[in-house]
């Protein structure tokens, strides 16, 4: 059996991680297939709707998909998400109870931070991969470049307010492995079952790393 990917390996394998909210469980599998077909394999399925865990369970069965759980805010969500098939977790912030849950569940956690002090506090707890959130209100590219000076060993996935147009500037930062974004999964396209459009969005996002 091969070793599971580390969180850093997962981040580096992606240019963009789509932030997904599933309103209809029937959309989960075709959405995952459409994204993977476009070259986007790492998927963050949030717990913002009641269908989150079910979607993780279904999407993790799609060949080529690397499925994580997003919007982790409660300790009990870690083990439940792991059992559903998530191989990494993402939280909007970091608390001691979430740290404890991540350790006990074994689910690699990408916690959200917004300030240099929060970066340093997470770093003291052993985290070297962090989510700058919300990225644009937090200072965007300028903040990332500034943090990279005193804290060069931290790697980020900025999320929040990023678009296909602004993503290349973030990806050009030395301390950015990937970005998170919701533009790959527009609600109108999902509702219409326009999976071909989502595949095209995924292809454009996957090409950002090679650009």
Language model region names:
Residues 43-47, 68-69, 91, 112, ...:
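Short beta-strand segments at enzyme active-site cores
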Residues 88-101, 131-141, 174-197:
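Glycine-rich phosphate-binding active-site loops on the catalytic face of alpha/beta enzymes
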Residues 1-87, 104, 164-165, 172, ...:
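Conserved N-terminal beta1-alpha1 strand-loop-helix module at the mouth
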């Amino acid at each position: 059996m091969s070793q599971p990917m580390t969180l850093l390996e997962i981040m580096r394998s992606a240019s963009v991680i789509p932030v997904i909210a599933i309103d209809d469980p029937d959309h989960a599998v075709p959405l995952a297939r459409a994204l993977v077909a476009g070259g986007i394999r790492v998927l963050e399925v949030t717990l913002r709707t009641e269908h989150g865990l079910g979607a993780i369970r279904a999407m993790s069965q799609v060949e080529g998909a690397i499925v994580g759980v997003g919007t982790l805010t409660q300790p009990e969500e870690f083990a439940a998400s792991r059992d559903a098939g998530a191989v990494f977790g993402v939280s909007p912030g970091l608390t001691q109870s979430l740290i404890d849950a991540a350790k006990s569940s074994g689910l690699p956690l990408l916690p959200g931070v917004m300030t240099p002090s929060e970066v340093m506090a997470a770093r003291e707890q052993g985290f070297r991969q962090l989510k700058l959130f919300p990225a644009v209100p937090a200072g965007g590219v300028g903040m990332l470049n500034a943090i990279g000076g005193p804290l060069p060993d931290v790697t980020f996935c900025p999320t929040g307010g990023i678009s296909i147009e602004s993503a290349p500037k973030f990806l050009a930062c030395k301390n950015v492995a990937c970005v998170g974004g919701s533009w790959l999964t527009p609600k109108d396209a999902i509702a219409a079952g326009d999976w071909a459009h989502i595949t095209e969005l995924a292809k454009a996002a996957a090409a950002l790393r090679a650009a």
